[in-house]
Amino acid sequence: MNNSVKKIVFSFQGKLSRSEYFLYTLFVWLSYYVLYSCIWYIISDNMTIILSPFLLWALFAISTKRLHDLWRSGKFLFLVLIPVLGFVYLFIILFFKKSSIINNRYIEWNKVEWDYLKNPSACKIEWLDGDERIVNEVTGLHPVLVSKVETPTSIQDVLHVLKNTAWPISVWGGRFSMWGQTASYNSTHLDMRGMNQVVDFNKKEKTIKVQSWMRWCDIQKYIDVHNLSISIMQTYANFTVWGSLSVNVHWRYIWLGPLILSVRSIDIILSDVTLKHASRTKNKEIFFGAIGWYNALWVIAQAELELEKNVAVKRVNKKMPTSEYKDYFIKYIRSKKKSIFHNWDMYPPHYKSINAVTWEKTNEKPTTKTRLMYWWKDYSLEKIFFWIFSELPFWKWFREYMVDPLLFAGKKVHMRNYEAWYDVADLEPNSRKKSTYVLLEYFVPIDRFEEFTNVMAEIYKRHNVNIINVSMRHAHPDTESYMSWAREEVFAFVVYYKQATSEVEKNKVAVWTRELEDAVIAVNGAYYLPYQAHATSEQFHKAYPWAKKLFKLKSKLDPDFRFRNIIWDTYYKTDTLVEAISTSKETSEFKEVFLDTYWSDRFYLFLQNIYHIYPEDSFHYLISQSTKKCNSDE
């Protein structure tokens, strides 16, 4: 949090839009009020004077950055010395004047410093002289040791690596998945970020063919000049096409669904070092198996995607009780052909109200001066608010009743590409050392919406989960992908929460995550695989009943199990492990319980609801660690 505060309070570089300036000003005055009250109450009212220089400095800094947005120098603030008229003039331009053009001498430094957030490269291990590297994902919770990292830049390079290595193969995308979906222990790890070029573009047919490690933001920049937009992409433009294909992503597109619905064809490198072209009509078994199957069989080298016209969209939002949402969606959103994007945010900690946001096609003029969002934007304020919402009491209430009404006040009209130009940096904390932010996602048939919502809320409350936000999207059925998470029309619950990085907390999260996965399976839904793989093998197959088709296909096309990652290390070919556990002759009853995930979780619930003498999370973890060290209960 410190770096973010410094950027707001002490930095005079950068720019602030009107809405950002308003929020920054509100934050400064609220902070001043809290500190003033504490000093006045604890020490004396005379000591409150020490806050004045800090208040003036902060207001001067953020006002300077607002003037930069208007292409003016911070020296304009000296107009306040002119009685009445100077203050009135500054107030009007700071709070009401629209932004000036993006490129001006006050903000050019940002272009040099910022790009879309990227995860760092694999880390060398200092005490080893070999090629081993540590590969981690965005949460920092699940590092994986790989034997070697290769960096191909072409299909020929990939073929060369596959021919000349006997190690298992894992493939690196953007590494924004939150377990080990891009890595496997002791594998040859392919860092494919060099394969990021446009292969073919057809403006008339509205299609584009790209190398699979091109990011969505790079495609947007390429096609925006032709007034075209990506048909279906992932929420954040940082992610690669390969990563999105591997997880069969979706977004807020109301008339669409999973990414596979907008894919024309793919070019795939198989484990036998052959290149195949696959589509709905050619090698369709490979096509339907590749998309959404997390690099289990092949390397998706290139993809041909469908495009749409880039149109203006207008924001419309409505707050309502959660119980009224399904009827509202069916009556006002699903039946409206002009709706382009739609999602809602459910407010923790009570989950009784939501804010539904729709972006509708419009002929109105955009309220932003640029066709694409500022890719170098500073997210200091967002980081501070995320920390406040997650750490301080009553601030979730403050967000619902104070912050969001301000954020959603006024008219907003964007171009479709602008609204799809999100940077995952706005979710990234300054540090993930002691705590981290994590995503989960659940797909619920729309007719079971209220049933699942009530169970979800109860689980989060009982386990005291630090939920930041629950956002929902809509998706139409996908009957093509073997790993389809939308076998019927669904609502997608995207859960953003905060957890500590301690082993006790990891164990606690695993327990309530599996409980929630049971809840979504009970309503004939599914959980999303890009996140922490806590589910049991039984839960996996219940959520993805077509997975056995893919296992059969993998045994045919990758009999040596060359293509791997933590997902398939966990769920593929687990029969041997299950047999080993079932035939174990351990005499410890505690060990028998903790060797079985189902009974281990039931024991956690017993500690939580019946034997509630000690904190169940710490006590459960202590017992589980003790059983690993002992072979009996004595």
Predicted features along the sequence, with ranges:
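Membrane-interface extramembranous regions at the lipid-water interface
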Residues: M1-S31, L59-F76, I92-Y116
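Membrane-helix interface segments in multi-pass membrane proteins
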Residues: S31-L59, V80, F95-S99
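Glycine-rich N-terminal segment of FAD-binding domains in flavoprotein oxidoreductases
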Residues: G140-I232, N248-Y253, M472
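N-terminal regions that are enriched for targeting/export leaders
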Residues: L117-E137
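Substrate-recognition/cap regions that form aromatic- and gly/pro-loop-enriched pockets
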Residues: V413-A535, Q539-K542
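Structural signature of FAD isoalloxazine-binding scaffolds in flavoprotein oxidoreductases
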Residues: W179-V199, I254-V273, V299-L305, F493
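Activity-critical C-terminal alpha-helical subdomain
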Residues: D426, I521-S624, K628-D633
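C-terminal substrate-binding/cap subdomain adjacent to the FAD-binding core in PCMH-type
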Residues: S246, R264-E458, R462, N466, ...
